[in-house]
A protein has these predicted regions:
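Non-catalytic linker/capping segments at the edges of enzyme domains
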Residues: 1-53
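A conserved, well-ordered hydrophobic junction motif at loop->secondary-structure transitions
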Residues: 40-76
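Short, surface-exposed charged micro-motifs
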Residues: 29-31, 102, 116-118
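Hydrophobic beta-strand-centered segment that forms part of the acyl-chain substrate-binding groove
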Residues: 72-114
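Hydrophobic residues in beta-strands and at strand termini
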Residues: 43-45, 103, 149
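Low-complexity, flexible helical/coil segments
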Residues: 67-69, 76-83, 100, 135-136, ...
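HotDog/MaoC-like acyl-thioester-processing domains
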Residues: 1-8, 105-163
Length: 163
């Protein structure tokens, strides 16, 4: 993708997450984008993301659902604002309040994983995202993230701590 991802717009104070932080050199650094009304992210598991030979371990899959969901929540909230500048992207941050994952089939290693999400509910500071992971076009995982917007008081506390 040529446009910036949702995560590219996170303020640096919120860009350290292992799953989606652009400033975490050891993390996954996932990149999520809009594809119509759905969000999409691609991730290629490394050989060390193994569960049993040939298959991805469930913790990685949960992490992908988690971080793609919070990124989608931030982008969905931003998209819903009437005063948004169409040439900008979200810089708000959301955190996981609830994560539910259903493992439907073993997910193979060595193939590009496609993570997709869709906004199920957007109300106040809460966004519910339904998601699924595809391997070779087959849904292997379904999940749901309930994400809440980071309170301004937490942002202020983090900024103070950096000074």
């Amino acid at each position: 993708m040529t446009q910036p991802s949702f995560q590219d717009h996170y303020p640096d104070i919120f860009a350290h997450c292992y799953g989606c932080g652009k400033l975490n050199e050891h993390g996954h650094q996932i990149k999520s984008y809009w594809d119509g009304e759905e969000s999409v992210c691609h991730f290629m598991p490394k050989p060390y993301h193994i569960a049993i030979p040939g298959y991805v371990y469930g913790g990685l899959l949960a992490s992908l659902i988690d971080c793609h969901g919070t990124g989608t929540a931030a982008a969905a909230m931003y998209r819903s604002l009437k005063e948004q500048d169409p040439n900008t992207q979200p810089n708000t941050r959301f955190l996981t309040a609830s994560l539910h994952v259903d493992y439907l089939k073993p997910t193979p290693l060595g193939v590009d994983l496609e993570i997709r999400g869709k906004v199920k509910e957007l109300k106040g500071r809460k966004v519910v995202i339904e998601e699924w992971i595809l391997a070779n076009g087959i849904i292997t995982v379904r999940g749901e993230v309930i994400a809440v917007q980071v309170p301004e008081s937490m942002v202020e506390e983090l900024v103070k701590g950096k000074q």
